[in-house]
């Protein structure tokens, strides 16, 4: 990077491991400025529990970004609504979590931050607080007024994007329409080029049905919907291979010649990726007007404040965000 950049981090659920992981991030120097949108006392208390040094530096958007020294974080303060006790969810803090996400998102939209990295939230407690919340992806899509976003998870070796996300199985076949596939593949192709620096992305596309429909004997969605869309997009120059049976696609024969996989639904593509690299994976939201990465795990309430949480996924998410910033410059 030609000059230091500034990214914003949201720790997520205050009773979970998110604050622990953010404190652990601070134990090394970073070539970018890490602005944490959180309650300062929460981070200080959690650092003391973990026995780790932490100094909080004031955030000033008018001061040029600078590399982050080890043992420090730059604080963009948002106040807790109630005390946060490790491992104990508090409905009163649901609005706090949403406020951190909103402030971080708005900062990316107005150019304050080059990327957003999110820690794990607890969707249930946010909804229990009376705030409808499906997840980070949908929240940022709505707040940024993005036309459409695509969820992609990645490890060092594998990228898997999803045509549909949090839908029950009985609804998926109806959701796989030509319009949806055109939109999802266009976003995936565009962001692989612009945010990952891949000049001509090669995308493997899963079929929907077992054996990719077996020529129509196990479902006709491939023949009626998926194949016509892929043919149209290939004619435009996209490098698409599929539809392929999901049970044989995830092997070196195919993956060695691909930059990403498009799965038709959540549990078709993600079990393979998480088996291969759980704890090292990153969740990326494609289609947003800014870079957003996230850890691939939950709040792990039982580990909060105990010094046993693994910071690996957070480090990977932050490093990937840095690479994506470089690719977009």
UniProtKB/Swiss-Prot annotation:
One Pfam entry name: PdxA
Keyword field: Cobalt, Cytoplasm, Magnesium, Metal-binding, NAD, NADP, Oxidoreductase, Pyridoxine biosynthesis, Zinc
Cofactor annotation remark: Binds 1 divalent metal cation per subunit. Can use ions such as Zn(2+), Mg(2+) or Co(2+).
EC number of this enzyme: 1.1.1.262
Broadest EC class assigned to this enzyme: oxidoreductase
Catalysis performed (reactions): 4-(phosphooxy)-L-threonine + NAD(+) = 3-amino-2-oxopropyl phosphate + CO2 + NADH
Pathway(s) per entry: Cofactor biosynthesis; pyridoxine 5'-phosphate biosynthesis; pyridoxine 5'-phosphate from D-erythrose 4-phosphate: step 4/5
Amino acids binding a divalent metal cation: 166, 211, 266
SUPFAM superfamilies registered for this protein in UniProt: Isocitrate/Isopropylmalate dehydrogenase-like
One MF term in the entry's GO annotations: magnesium ion binding
Sequence positions that bind substrate: 136-137, 274, 283, 292
One Gene Ontology term, aspect cellular component: cytoplasm
Known cofactor(s): Zn(2+); Mg(2+); Co(2+)
Transmembrane segments: none
Subunit structure and binding partners: Homodimer.
Similarity section: Belongs to the PdxA family.
Function: Catalyzes the NAD(P)-dependent oxidation of 4-(phosphooxy)-L-threonine (HTP) into 2-amino-3-oxo-4-(phosphooxy)butyric acid which spontaneously decarboxylates to form 3-amino-2-oxopropyl phosphate (AHAP).
Stated name of the protein: 4-hydroxythreonine-4-phosphate dehydrogenase
Annotated source species: Salmonella typhi
Gene behind this protein: pdxA
């Amino acid at each position: 990077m030609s000059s230091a950049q500034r990214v914003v981090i949201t720790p997520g659920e205050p009773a979970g491991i998110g604050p622990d992981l953010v404190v652990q991030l601070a134990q090394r120097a970073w070539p970018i400025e890490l602005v944490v949108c959180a309650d300062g006392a929460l981070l200080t208390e959690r650092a003391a529990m973990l026995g780790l040094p932490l100094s909080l530096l004031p955030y000033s958007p008018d001061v040029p970004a600078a590399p982050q020294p080890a043992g420090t974080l730059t604080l963009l303060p948002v106040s807790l609504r109630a005390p946060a006790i490790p491992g104990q969810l508090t409905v009163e803090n649901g609005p706090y979590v949403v406020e951190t996400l909103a402030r971080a998102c708005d900062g990316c939209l107005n150019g304050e931050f080059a990327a957003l990295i999110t820690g794990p939230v607890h969707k249930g407690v946010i909804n229990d607080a009376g705030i409808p919340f499906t997840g980070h992806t949908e929240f940022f899509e709505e707040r940024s007024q993005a036309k459409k976003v695509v969820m992609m998870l990645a490890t060092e070796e594998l990228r898997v994007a999803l045509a549909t996300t949090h839908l029950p199985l009985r609804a998926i076949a109806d959701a796989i329409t030509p319009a949806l596939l055109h939109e999802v593949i266009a976003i995936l192709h565009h962001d692989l080029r612009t945010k990952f620096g891949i000049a001509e992305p090669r995308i493997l596309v899963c079929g929907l049905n077992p054996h990719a429909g077996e020529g129509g004997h196990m479902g006709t969605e491939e023949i009626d919907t998926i194949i016509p869309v892929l043919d149209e997009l290939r004619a435009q120059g996209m490098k698409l291979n599929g539809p392929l049976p999901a049970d044989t696609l995830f092997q070196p024969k195919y993956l060695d010649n691909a930059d990403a996989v498009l799965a038709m639904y959540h549990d078709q593509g993600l079990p393979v990726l998480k088996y291969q690299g759980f704890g090292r994976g990153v969740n990326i939201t494609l289609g947003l007007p800014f870079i957003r990465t996230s850890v691939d795990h939950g709040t792990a309430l039982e580990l909060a404040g105990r010094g046993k949480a693994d910071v690996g996924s957070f480090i990977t998410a932050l490093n990937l965000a840095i690479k994506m910033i470089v690719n977009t410059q």
